[in-house]
């Protein structure tokens, strides 16, 4: 493995932005092509969700596995960190990165709680779920979930049809034909 200089690492990290990332663009393009309309980075909602689908009362966060600690466990009693396959914690300045990722995870949980209290649904899509081998299934699942949310929100829940007593002539006639 090649060792990068501190300057090169700094340049790489500085080039990473929070908006218009490749995973976000994949999700945006897929949703738009399937007819879903959305707003980007809404400043009116906590956490500035990547995509906001007002019609579905749904916020979508497209998270990078490293920055949001996908499947990373921090054992606070010993300070041990269990890296996941898609999120490797750097060995240099490890304490800094563990603290940063843990703060990001806590912030994500708090943001989703606040959005849920406001009546919004939250969907998190991880960068590793958009790899070519999993991409189509992830995007189909996202579209299915959004349609399910819409149907649940717009379900007609009312009283069932009234049941008639046996004396009702139409009911008796219907039973006799059967």
Describe every region a protein language model picked out.
Residues 1-124, 128-178:
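Nucleic-acid endo/exonuclease domains
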